[in-house]
Amino acid sequence: MNIVLFGPPGCGKGTQSKRLVAERGWVQLSTGDMLRHARAAGTELGRRVAAIMDGGNLVSDAIVIELIEERLPEAKAAGGAIFDGFPRTVAQAQALDQLLLDRGTQVDSVIELKVNDEELVQRLVKRAEEEGRPDDTEDVIRKRLEVYYGQTAPLIPFFAQQGKVKAVDGMGSMDEVAAGIAAALEEK
């Protein structure tokens, strides 16, 4: 099963993704983690990633897709993949659909974690304080939310047209959200 965990910064994607990995044995495909790992590994692809990132540039969709492609056999063997932080644009979603289709599989479900903006801001401010991120001010966090709603949220209609979006209330406890995700994954 291939699922996309979707929602704004602070909605709990990373937390719930790690939980699904622990409970179901699936592979988490977090683009941020994959970029850092590729860079640290020093492979040819990793050196390309490092050069791009060191130049202050965004890594292209093609390279991100290449990183995902490298991990798909592992995900297949594990029985599933959790896409966390990808796709972020319709172009990336189309590329992911094609990549999976070429391998005889697909995105099975898109779990949209719904959390109101004020709760998101509170969570992110708290996380910034706990993790010592002085740059994550409330203004910066609100800007990140604006970017999400402007650039990433338009993916919901893309996947909704395919009948794959399942909304889950992300306002509860971690256990309540996990139960909501489990129920959504059982829906056909």
UniProtKB/Swiss-Prot annotation:
Compartment(s): Cytoplasm
Subunit note: Monomer.
Gene name per UniProt: adk
Domain characteristics, as noted in the entry: Consists of three domains, a large central CORE domain and two small peripheral domains, NMPbind and LID, which undergo movements during catalysis. The LID domain closes over the site of phosphoryl transfer upon ATP binding. Assembling and dissambling the active center during each catalytic cycle provides an effective means to prevent ATP hydrolysis.
Protein name: Adenylate kinase
NCBIfam families to which the protein is assigned, alphabetical: PRK00279.1-3, PRK14527.1, PRK14531.1, PRK14532.1
Residues annotated as binding AMP: T31, R36, N57, L58, V59, G85, F86, P87, R88, Q92, R133, R144
GO cellular component, one term: cytoplasm
Similarity annotation: Belongs to the adenylate kinase family.
Region annotated NMP, chain positions: 30-59
